Regions:
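AMP-binding adenylation
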Residues: 1-150
Length: 150
């Protein structure tokens, strides 16, 4: 519930982002706030394929893969240069705007930030059943979240 009294069900926002090719996970934030913001975890494998197809350079030495998350290695971390790349920012922003078109104005994500690693059980943000540990995420990214509301 926003501080305006409007109720914004995070499941609705999360389910709309589940259709995105380039965004793996979104953690909507809005409780007792003026507007909805979000933490975005990209689908790094899809984003890397996009970068490679477009010939967009990035620091390949900063990319980390995990062989334990499925049948094929999964990208779990990229370098800061990757998430700060202008093409990448446009790509993610386009995905956010696509979802925002499906939402009421008070439900729309007004500000967000993108993390450079995949949330997993090993990094502490996910449960064994792959549910987001919201309290952990809110504590871990407190400064970044507060900055969105300044």
């Amino acid at each position: 519930v926003l501080d305006t009294g409007k109720n914004v069900p995070s499941q609705r926002i999360e389910s709309l982002f589940s259709l995105s090719q380039f965004i793996e996970l979104v953690v909507p934030i809005g409780s007792e706030r003026k507007f909805v913001s979000a933490i975005i975890v990209p689908n790094f494998d899809a984003c890397i394929a996009y970068f490679d197809a477009k010939g967009i350079p990035y620091d390949k030495s900063a990319v980390v893969y995990d062989n334990n998350l499925g049948p094929a290695p999964v990208c779990v971390k990229v370098g800061k240069d990757f998430v700060e790349n202008e093409e990448f920012k446009k790509l993610i922003d386009k995905e956010v705007q696509t979802v925002n078109k499906e939402l009421e104005s008070y439900e729309q994500i007004k500000k967000y930030f993108v993390v450079d690693y995949k949330f997993t059980e090993a990094t502490g943000e996910m449960t064994p059943t792959l549910k987001v540990k919201r309290r952990v995420v809110m504590e871990k990214f407190k400064e970044e979240i507060d900055a969105l509301y300044k």
